[in-house]
A protein has these predicted regions:
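Conserved beta-strand segments of the P-loop GTPase G domain that flank and frequently precede/overlap
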Residues: 20, 75-77, 149-151, 171-173
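Conserved ATPase-coupling elements of RecA-like P-loop NTPase cores
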Residues: 29-30, 79-88, 102-105, 116-134, ...
Length: 219
């Protein structure tokens, strides 16, 4: 839900927004607040609600199209038959998108739903090219106008090189040991005061729906 609010704010302010959706839920941006009627004018590629289907070999073509037109889009990968097809598509997309943005600078935000699908901490061999492409976007993309919003229920599954590059961290209620360990490591990397860190981490299991803690140590 919080990610959707961010996306709405970006779209309201005319910022190109591209959602990489591996769960098939972001089509709701096109619906009105009551679940009916018209929402935002955003293209959907792939999935049950797609305007056009996704072809595993068309990642580079779609990246080129979105850079050229500067249109917002939802890329729904739920229709791919295999994980291999999804990884190939996203590797091609991310590599081409970054390369073209180097020559075509403009503001755009990539939203990675279930970010551990795209930037896994423990990648399989077939995920390495995709991971490398997104790592480069996370590390250097801001120089060309690319912002990155990574959403995950499993922060321990998100590659640490990318997680540690995050300027702002929103943490909603979590109680799992491994999840809290990943958050602790991020706060330690960013040199958050130990007393503040321990108090905040102790609050996480008790947060209610819609409540979150926000860390922004560089601001």
């Amino acid at each position: 839900y919080a990610g959707g609010v961010f996306a709405e704010e970006l779209l309201e302010n005319g910022i190109q927004t591209i959602v990489l959706d591996s769960v098939g839920v972001w089509y709701g941006l096109r619906l009105g607040a009551n679940g009916k009627g018209r929402g935002y004018d955003i293209h959907i590629f792939g999935g049950e609600h797609g305007d056009l289907p996704l072809i595993p070999t068309a990642g580079a073509v779609l990246a080129e199209t979105l850079v050229r037109t500067r249109k917002s889009a939802i890329i729904d990968t739920t229709g791919f038959a295999t994980e291999a097809e999804q990884r190939r598509f996203m590797a091609d997309f991310a590599e081409t998108f970054y390369r073209l943005k180097m020559r075509n600078k403009s503001r755009v935000t990539l939203i990675l739903e279930e970010a551990d699908d795209w930037i896994p901490q423990m990648p399989e061999t077939t995920e390495l090219r995709m991971l490398g492409a997104f790592q480069r976007i996370a590390r250097k993309g801001r120089n060309f106008g690319i912002g990155l919003l990574a959403i995950s229920q499993r922060p321990q599954g998100v590659h640490k090189k990318v997680l540690n590059l995050s300027d702002v961290l929103f943490v909603f209620g979590i109680s799992g040991k491994h999840e809290r360990k990943a958050i602790r490591e991020w706060t330690e990397y960013n040199e958050i005061d130990e007393d503040v860190r321990d108090k905040a981490l102790g609050m996480l299991p008790g947060l209610k729906m819609g409540q979150c803690l926000v860390w922004a140590p560089r601001f």
